[in-house]
């Protein structure tokens, strides 16, 4: 593993770490955020496809790639709704924890990961630590009824959103399509869902004509940059899948801290300390789940 590989592996730290903060900073409704983000991702994917000479796949590879992108868009819409309730700095550790749990459980029960009783015990204990870490990131010193209600609603929303993120990661595994080949059709699937969602919400305003929707394209560039650098990082001649995944999960730290300091999603000193400990627990436990043989 060389310096260049590490730099590329940290690309998702910047892309996925800043994506929720930038999307929240531009503001707008979830429909504005998802439309702009998916259009930005599609633009990025088209440029990449033209640069590398990658065409659209055919057959079921195309279908599952479109479904994958649609799943992400569904999950991200739900996540944007959770941002409205508790802010990105609190929602991101929760959704990251749920995604780690979903990916790990899928790997165990569908792909045969963590063979043997000992590995399964270690793995499930690590998942428990991830949940504890996520809970620590939303702890507050003052018990406010409205916050507790919003937090419960956000957690339920993010649980539902995990279905979409699971589809995003699992659907391409139904074929032998590579990450680069799937990138463009995934982006197309994302935009299709975003357009449908925007049409369904026309009674609340025309997202296609609202300036903030087009500003959100910038947030989409950050998401797409993270996705691309993750694909490169996960290659065997770079960091490999396991190390690349762990490096990418550091994005939750940046997403949480930038939400606190740049979006004024304030925490007391004690809350901030407990949040940081919770984030460390999530990262350490996530690393354990990946490196279990």
Swiss-Prot record:
Record PANTHER family: TRANSMEMBRANE PROTEIN 144
Compartment(s): Cell membrane
Function comment: Could be involved in the uptake of ribose.
The keyword Transmembrane helix belongs to this UniProt entry's keyword annotation: yes
UniProt protein name: Putative ribose uptake protein RbsU
Predominant localisation class: membrane
CDD domains: ribose_uptake_RbsU
Source organism of this protein record: Staphylococcus epidermidis (strain ATCC 12228 / FDA PCI 1200)
Lineage, top ranks: Bacteria, Bacillati, Bacillota, Bacilli, Bacillales
Family membership noted in the UniProt record: Belongs to the GRP transporter (TC 2.A.7.5) family.
Keyword Nucleotidyltransferase in record: no
UniProt keyword annotations, A-Z: Cell membrane, Membrane, Sugar transport, Transmembrane, Transmembrane helix, Transport
GO cellular component: plasma membrane
A GO MF label: carbohydrate transmembrane transporter activity
Membrane spanning stretches: 5-24, 34-51, 58-80, 95-114, 121-138, 153-170, 177-199, 212-234, 241-263, 273-292
Membrane disposition: Multi-pass membrane protein
């Amino acid at each position: 593993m060389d310096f260049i590989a590490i730099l590329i592996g940290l690309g998702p730290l910047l892309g996925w770490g800043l994506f929720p903060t930038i999307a929240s900073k531009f503001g707008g409704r979830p429909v504005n955020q998802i439309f702009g983000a998916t259009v930005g991702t599609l633009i990025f994917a088209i440029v990449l496809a033209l640069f590398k000479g990658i065409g659209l796949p055919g057959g079921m590879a195309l279908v599952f790639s479109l479904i994958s992108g649609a799943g992400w868009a569904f999950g991200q819409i739900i996540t944007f709704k959770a941002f409205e309730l508790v802010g990105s700095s609190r929602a991101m550790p929760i959704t990251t924890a749920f995604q780690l749990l979903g990916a790990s459980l899928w790997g165990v029960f569908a792909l045969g990961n963590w063979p043997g009783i000992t590995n399964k015990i270690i793995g499930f204990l690590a998942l428990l630590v991830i949940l504890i870490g996520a809970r620590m990131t939303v702890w507050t010193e003052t018990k406010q009824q409205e916050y507790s209600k919003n937090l419960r609603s956000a957690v339920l929303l993010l649980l539902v959103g995990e279905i979409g993120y699971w589809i995003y990661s699992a659907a391409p595994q139904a074929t032998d399509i590579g990450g680069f080949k799937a990138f463009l059709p995934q982006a197309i699937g994302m935009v299709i869902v975003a357009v449908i969602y925007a049409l369904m919400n026309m009674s609340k305003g025309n997202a296609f004509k609202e300036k903030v929707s087009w500003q959100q394209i910038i947030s989409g560039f950050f998401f797409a940059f993270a996705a691309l650098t993750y694909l490169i990082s996960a290659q065997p001649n770079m960091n490999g899948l396991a190390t690349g995944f762990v490096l990418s999960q550091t994005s939750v730290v940046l997403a949480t801290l930038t939400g606190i300091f740049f979006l004024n999603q304030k925490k007391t000193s004690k809350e901030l300390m407990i949040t940081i400990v919770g984030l460390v627990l999530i990262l350490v436990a996530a690393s354990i789940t990946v490196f279990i043989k």
